[in-house]
Amino acid sequence: MRLIVVSGQSGAGKSVALRVLEDLGYYCVDNLPVSLLTAFIQSVQGSQQNVAVSIDIRNLPKEPSLVQDVLDQLKQNNDVSMLFLDASKETLLKRYSETRRIHPLSLSQSKPSLAQAIELEKQLLGPLKEQADLLLDSSNQSLHELSETVRMRIEGRERKDLVMVFQSFGFKYGLPTDADYVFDVRFLPNPHWEPDLRPLTGLDAPIKSFLEGHSEVMELKQQIQKFFEYWLPMLEKNNRSYLTIAIGCTGGKHRSVYLTQQLGEYFAQLGHQVQIRHTSLEKQQS
């Protein structure tokens, strides 16, 4: 039997992840006390159905090491993994403002502000985050995008396929927190300084023509392709379920978007499971 523990910050998308897992055939339980987890797993052992359980700030034991002890015990007879959903403080503040929901820690006796509650929860969940097998940052993702990301990561893990996530970003918005590899392409020729090209993105044909007219752009693309072609077999043997490759330029609009799209399409054509995201572009268009 397979058990996925879903954890993460309040407002980061745990309920979305549980709905996706339910659609994938998992028996999902929200807010189950950790002390009851072993007994619950034993009770459903005979059904042969995969199970997903959420552990978060609502049911976190006072002693964080208890979670690891319980999971270590369950791993002896089950395939156990943890999915942790995270999001930036700014994203969480915006989501709570839009939904007008109350943060779980805001109900405590100290009655912290929303910003304080988010920061405190981050500290309390730190040990769980360190144990995560799958770490997803839902910042700047819509419900549909997050659902698709969770589905691809879970399905890829079940098939033992490595999911390659190609992600463009702008350095002025900050580094992505979930990247395994980061390529800084700010040294490449910048279409931003061409007035006719400035409003366009790396997905538009004139930007492609501009960048493909520079040999250094094509050489860098080929070198990144060769790097991952060479090392992918080793990464796949390392029991990884996904690999996040982030490519950044200044604003995340032209150079990084072009290279991310090209690399993602290249590896998809080779038969790999690929997901392409343009995080800063999505932020600019929202």
Curated annotation (Swiss-Prot):
Tell me a Gene Ontology molecular-function term this record carries. Answer: ATP binding
**Sites where the protein binds ATP:** 8-15
Q: Which InterPro entries match?
A: P-loop_NTPase, RapZ-like, RapZ-like_N, RapZ_C
Binding positions (GTP): 56-59
Functionally, this protein is described as follows: Displays ATPase and GTPase activities.
Q: Read off the HAMAP family from this record.
A: RapZ_like
Stated name of the protein: Nucleotide-binding protein VC0395_A2112/VC395_2645
Source species: Vibrio cholerae serotype O1 (strain ATCC 39541 / Classical Ogawa 395 / O395)
